[in-house]
Amino acid sequence: ESISSFSGIYDSETKSAVTNFQYFASLPVEHYGVADLMTWASLLTSKGDTSRITHACDTSKTITDARLQILQNNGYWTYGRYLTGKYAMSAEEINRVLGPNANKGENEVKAKIFPIFQRTGAPIPSNRIEYFTPAQGTADGKEAVEAAYDFGFKNGTVIFFASDVDAYDYQVKEILLPYYKNVKTAFDQYKQRRYIMGLYGPRNTCIQVCDAGYALSCFVSDMSTGYSGNLGYPLPKSWAFDQYAGDEFGLKTDPDYTDIDKVAVSGSYHGEEEVKP
């Protein structure tokens, strides 16, 4: 949001602009209206103040009973997990995380899962720009919706397709947009359930893919502050999740060692509280 002029005085117009930004970036409400360090950090770097508290995370670790207890004891109730591949969730894991919700009241905190698609084991790794061809987009879109259906994710579930690569602007236009166009086509052709296409990636990628109409929701890879796609670009208007810092619990030698990425939540999409296989 812009203001009409800068006077050097923190007047009501400036305070309003600051508050609107803080609300948009989902900064803690107690900071609203104050141009403090947390606010400046969010303006100056993509990851912002990494000490800020959130209730969402993503992880490549299987959420066992022990890990679930660790995460919830530390305030994490929303989990990003992979649909397929080496780090995929299982039906048993989904039931472990979401099953207890059925016995909770309306005002009780419920666990949620948001699904991520990133292929592992491909001849070309999915963190290289060469991976993203139109044909791969068709294959990935089909595989993702079929996996989501098999797990029982309902209509309206957002699936976040990862492009974990620092694509330059011309690469977004020439390579990633055709890939995501074909992912969207695969979504539109799937009749069993209607899922919503989202993407994971740097800010510039998220902005362009959503502006093209291929995705409706973004999971922003803001931890990568040095990515060209995060330098000088605003937080996308369609952001749902914002990955901004790592965290870990326990020693790496412990069987229940848990490492996560902290994820801010905009409120436009919260994840899924139940599945119906």
Where are these regions (language model features)?
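Structural recognition of the beta-strand scaffold that forms the well-ordered cores
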Residues: T54-D58, W77-Y82, K112-F117, T157-A162, ...
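Substrate-binding cleft of extracellular glycoside hydrolase catalytic domains
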Residues: G85-A167
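Aromatic-lined carbohydrate-recognition surfaces of secreted/lumenal glycan-active proteins
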Residues: Y190-Q208, L216
